[in-house]
Amino acid sequence: MPFIQPGDKIGKMIFQAAKKQGTPIQQHDVIVVTHVVVSKSEGNVVNLDEVKPSEKALEIAKQTNKDPAMVEVILRETKEIVRIGQNSIITQTNSDIVCANAGVDRSNVSGDRNVVPLPKEPNSSASRIRKEIMHLSDAEVAVIVSDTHGRPFRMGEINIAVGYAGFKPIRDRRGEKDLFGYVLRIKQTAIADELASAAELVIGQANEGIPAAIVRGYNYTSDEEQTTQLMRAKEKDLFR
């Protein structure tokens, strides 16, 4: 796929790229696309030289040794600051995702002073891309908007779903029995995150230049609703 510009139709570009490389979109494919290209297509790119830091941003910048303008962008994307540490700000974003730096990304963005926040409404972005692909391919698909996140107690990052459309993102297995007849009580599998992580093995995080991947052969449960909350409720979150 070419470099993304504001106004580009991501769904159309994915459809065309898949066809060109000999792997056209098929029924029940899962399309995983990085949040950076989605935000770029939506014009959600910020030049730090055009940002005036607030007093709060200046204060946090001193604590974290971050660029005050970058901190200001993070604050604008933040509903709640969860924790401030050495060179890191853990936040709950305006779309309720808990992550470092509100998901504001410097990587794979042209211009030394440009950064890319998460899409304003990731689920809506996923829905729009899905509709574009389905219209062109005449195939039912699911779409995930992904981002790279760190995890408590674990080294290294993985991809997670920050937005989804067309399927149930969590498989609830409570009430099912295991091999020995034990009834599962808390087992809920984060399907969307697992698919996003699998796709990252192809997409990469550096200079691969692959903004989207097709996951083929997974038997997901189709669903038009987007009511499933992927973030744990604050009162049940042991880390907050």
Residue ranges and their predicted role:
Residues M1-R240:
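N-terminal and secondary-structure boundary signal
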